[in-house]
């Protein structure tokens, strides 16, 4: 698996089930850029495990970290922010065809009002 390229990151801070998305670009030199802001960081991969860390606070170890499993066109895992927030995420490589089953009946636990994220992908309050 080679993560280099454009990915769409879907993230959810907390167990709300409301995922928000943003583009993320992984460079061949072990860096990445969060396209919705001037944030960047570094990434590393070993076999099917991937880890990336934002460099929001370059002089500090307290930066948001994403870790998870990675396949050719999909990856998912957990994230931890510098403020102590926890969440889950998944990313799909740009250009990947994704199919899903649409439910005919809206199940009560899936009905939820649209909300704006309280935290952005790097864990900063919005």
Task: Give, region by region, the residue ranges found by the protein language model.
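Short beta-strand-to-coil "C-cap" segments at the C-terminal boundary of structured domains/repeats
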Residues: 69-70, 90-100
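N-terminal glycine/threonine-rich, aromatic-flanked beta-hairpin/loop signature
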Residues: 13-51, 57
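An anionic, turn-rich surface loop/hairpin at beta-sheet edges
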Residues: 52-70
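Short, well-ordered strand-loop elements centered on a beta-strand within folded domains, enriched
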Residues: 31-36, 51-53, 74-80, 100
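A structural detector for short beta-strand units
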Residues: 20-24, 38-41, 62-67, 86-89
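A short, structured loop/turn motif at beta-sheet edges
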Residues: 44-48, 69-74
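Tryptophan-anchored aromatic micro-motifs
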Residues: 1-19, 35-37, 45, 77-79, ...
């Amino acid at each position: 698996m080679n993560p280099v390229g454009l990915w769409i990151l879907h993230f959810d801070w907390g167990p709300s089930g409301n995922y928000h998305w943003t583009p993320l670009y992984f460079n061949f030199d072990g860096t990445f850029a969060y396209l919705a802001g001037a944030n960047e960081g570094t990434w590393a991969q070993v076999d099917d495990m991937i880890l990336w860390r934002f460099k929001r606070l370059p002089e500090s170890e307290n930066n948001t970290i994403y870790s998870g499993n990675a396949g050719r066109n999909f990856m998912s895992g957990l994230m931890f922010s510098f403020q102590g927030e926890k969440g889950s995420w998944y990313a799909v490589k740009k250009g990947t065809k994704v199919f899903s089953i649409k439910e005919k009946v809206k199940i009560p636990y899936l009905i939820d009002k649209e909300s704006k994220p309280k935290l952005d992908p790097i864990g900063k309050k919005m």
